[in-house]
Amino acid sequence: EEVLELVNLEKDRKLKIKALSGGMKRRLGIAQAILHNPKVLIVDEPTAGLDPEERIRFRNLLANLAEDKIVILSTHIVGDIESTCNNLAVLNGGRIIFNGTTDEIIESAKGYTYKVKVPKTRIHDFKNRYVITSQQDFGAYVETKILYKGKPESEFKRVDPTIEDGYLNLLYDIGGTKQ
């Protein structure tokens, strides 16, 4: 009962598994994994398929579990990393290319992250020249966030990087393009 409560399934404990939604089945799998209080818990994309409220609950559960056990989280969801991890490793082609703290991966992109307002008429050329980490369309122009290690142009505005910027910076450092 206690484990079902942790994963918010106590009210559904009498349902057959086939009657559970995809997110509920995922939470049931986590309940099975923590049932015998393992010293190491390995979870793969644990919040995929969960609604936003359950995603937050589950991130908090992982953070609490990590207080007295090792939790290995495999995910592509940056929000999961930001909410639950102190240390992380980045794999590329089966090799560890980074092992450190979340602050260290963010720091790796510091000084290389810019916001630039690009006229729509120039966006295609801009995409070919720079690593764009995000963009937002404002009609006549597109506000882009880029990684760039060369001398910045006058319209480039330096901004603080995120974990995602640090991750992309690592990938381009090891054999990427546009730098």
Please place each PLM-identified region on the residue numbering.
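ABC transporter nucleotide-binding domains
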Residues: 1-73, 78-92
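Conserved protein kinase catalytic domain
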Residues: 4, 59, 106, 164-168
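Residue-level marker of structural boundaries
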Residues: 5, 67, 111-114, 172, ...
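Non-catalytic surface loops within mature trypsin-like serine protease
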Residues: 11, 120, 148-150
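ABC transporter nucleotide-binding domain
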Residues: 58-145
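C-terminal coupling/interaction segments
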Residues: 130-179
